[in-house]
Amino acid sequence: MSDRLRELPELPDLPELLDEHGLGGVPEEPLRHDGWSGAELTRLTRSDGQRFVLKRDSHALDWIARVTGDDPELREAWLVRFNPVLPDPVRLPHLGAARDGVTIALLMPDLTGTLLAWEQPIDVPTLERVLDALAALHRAPWHEALPPAFPWTDRSRRLLLLTRVAATEYHAAGLQFGARFLGGWDAFDRLAPPAAAALMRQLSDDPRPLLTALDRLPATGLHGDLKLGNVGLATDGGVPLIDWQMTLVAPVAVELGWFLVSNIAGLPLPPEEILQRYRRAAGRPDDDAWAAERDLAVLTGLMLRGWRKGLDAEAGLRLPHGWTAAEDLTWWSREAVAAGDRLQ
C-alpha cells in the first residue's frame, strides 16, 4: 500500500467510533439482511431514538473479499476514510470505519425505509431517479480524488466472479452457493440457444477478447454492485448508496450489465429501454461509442448472471415488465451472440 494511503490515521478501535456518535454501551441487535457475501449486520438504537447499522466484515467472513483480492482493511473502509465528494444526488452515507478485533466495522445510519426493497418491483419514476443518480456518478471524476494505490476491484476478477469456471472452484472449496451457480449454468446450457451457450463457455475459459474490448473504452468510477437493494431514495432528493465492496474503475458497461441482470425481479422495463433511458440521462449521443458500451453491457451481464437466467427460465417465471423469463433469456442470448460477433 502506498505512503499516501498510510498517511491516514490508524483505524480507531470500535468503542472510540461508537463513543463519537453517542453509542457507547448501546446494545446491538442482529439485523436480518439479504446480502450473501458473509458480512454481519447489527442495529443499535441511541437514547434519542435514532437508529444505526454496524457492518462487520473481514476476509474470514466474506468470500467476495477473498476472491476479489480485497485489501485486508477492506476497500469499502478505505473509501469511507477518504470520503470522496460524490456528485449530487449520490451520497456515501457511512459515518466511519473502525477495527473490531479481527474484523473491520462500518457505521452508518439505519436506512430502513429509505433503501429500495430487495427483489421487489419498482415503478418507472423510481427507475428514472436511480438512472439519473447513476449517470451523475459516472459523469463525475470523483475517483480521481483517491490515491493511485487505492485498492480498486480488479475488473477481470469482477467480470469472472460468477462464471462456470468460478462456480466450479467455489463448489470444490466447499462454498454452499457453488452448487447453485453450477446448477444455473447447467440450466442455461439446456435452455439457451447453442450459440449463446458456446459463447459463454468461450468467454468464461478465455475472457481476453472481452477485457481487450473494455480496455478500448473510457473508464470511470463505478459503484460496482448496484443492486436496487443497495440504493436509497431519501425524502430530500438524495440517493445514498451502500455496499461499495466491489467499487472499481472501468467502463460504464460493467455497471450497466450488472445493474440489468441483478435487478431483473424489480425492473419495470425491458433491458433495451433501460439502456436508452440511461443513455439519455447521461447525455450520451446514440453513436458508435455508445453502441460499443451497449454491446459490452450485454456481454458483461450475461457473463455474470447467465446462471440466474437459466434458473428463472426453467422455473417459468414472469418478469415485472411482462416478458417471461424464457423470453428474457432469448433476448439476452440473441443480443450477446450479436455483440460477440462484433468483438472479432
Predicted regions and their residues:
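Conserved NTP-binding catalytic cores of kinases and kinase-like/nucleotidyltransferase enzymes
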Residues: 1-102, 210-214, 234-239, 338-344
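Active-site activation/catalytic loop segments of kinase-like enzymes and analogous catalytic loops
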Residues: 78, 252-284, 299-324
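Conserved structural core of kinase catalytic domains
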Residues: 96-127
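Conserved kinase catalytic-core helix
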Residues: 117-157
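Active-site catalytic-loop/activation-segment of kinase and kinase-like phosphoryl-transfer enzymes
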Residues: 150-210
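Protein kinase catalytic-loop region centered on the HRD/HxD motif
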Residues: 214-220
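Catalytic-loop of the protein kinase fold
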Residues: 221-223, 228
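Catalytic activation segment of kinase domains across protein kinase-like and atypical kinase folds
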Residues: 229-258
